[in-house]
């Protein structure tokens, strides 16, 4: 499970500012 999630972490972290910007 983590072997699948770890490669996605940089993408998820990079998308956080976009989500915050969309909420604002």
UniProtKB/Swiss-Prot annotation:
Coiled coil: none
Record's keyword annotation contains Plastid: no
Disulfide bonds: none
GO terms (BP aspect): defense response to bacterium; killing of cells of another organism
Compartments reported by the entry: Secreted
Tissue note: Expressed by the skin glands.
Any GO MF annotation of the entry: toxin activity
GO CC annotation terms, alphabetical: extracellular region
UniProt entry keywords in alphabetical sequence: Antibiotic, Antimicrobial, Cytolysis, Hemolysis, Secreted, Toxin
Subunit structure: Exists as aggregates of 3-4 molecules.
Family designation: Belongs to the grammistin family. Group 1 subfamily.
Function field: Thanks to its abundant amphiphilic alpha-helices, it may integrate into membrane phospholipids, leading to lysis of the membrane. Its hemolytic activity is inhibited by phospholipids, but not by cholesterol. Has antibacterial activity with a broad spectrum against various species of bacteria including both Gram-positive and Gram-negative groups. Also has ichthyotoxic activity.
Name of the protein in question: Grammistin Pp 4b
Provenance organism: Pogonoperca punctata (Clown grouper)
